[in-house]
Amino acid sequence: MQQKLEDKHVHKGLRKQMVDLLREKGITDESVLTAINAVPRHYFLDSAFVTHAYEDRAFPIGEGQTISHPHTVAYQTQLLQINKSEKVLEIGTGSVYQATILAEMGARVYTIERQKKLYDLHKDYVFKAKYPTIKFFYGDGFEGLPTYAPFDKIIITAAAPFIPPKLVEQLKQGGIMVLPVNEGDGDQQRMIRISKDANGEITEESFDIFSFVPMLTGKNR
């Protein structure tokens, strides 16, 4: 993270250029673009990468994890169809950037991180006062948070080997889950959207190919 956090005109200008690029790449949900334009991505990166914060690139954040490409964040968020005040479960807190975008859109975010070192950093989350609706948990993403279920929306930000059944159970009727699921040898993932109707029936839609770090079981200390 940066030692001194400032959001200058140059950052805002670069952020607007990034949003324009996302629009060119097919992101059409203005609420998603507005949220991305409002959140300073450079706050979530190691100082070594700050000058590249508004390029459409992923960057390492430690513990073998990354902050996703802005296009990936926008793509998943658009598929979620977020409405204000919805309760959203995020699997893979990482840098907290995705959770912050969701909170900026008015969601109440419950986010799980399995890497203890990353989880411990979340106590210093820079926007804690601005987004008190983000709740942090240390745990196994495959288990979800049954105590807090059901959730209106669920987002998984790591490559799932399969659609986790416990997370489908925790999805509210009328809810949506978006996740990347391994294809072939697992080097790439197909983005999947799961919808649960009022009768609890599941519909699965397939979208584009992406590349994520793997979703792992258990908790890593």
Regions found by a protein language model. Give the residues of each.
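Class I SAM-dependent transferase core
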Residues: M1-L89, Y97-I101, M105, L118-D120, ...
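Conserved nucleotide-cofactor-binding alpha/beta core module
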Residues: Q81-T203
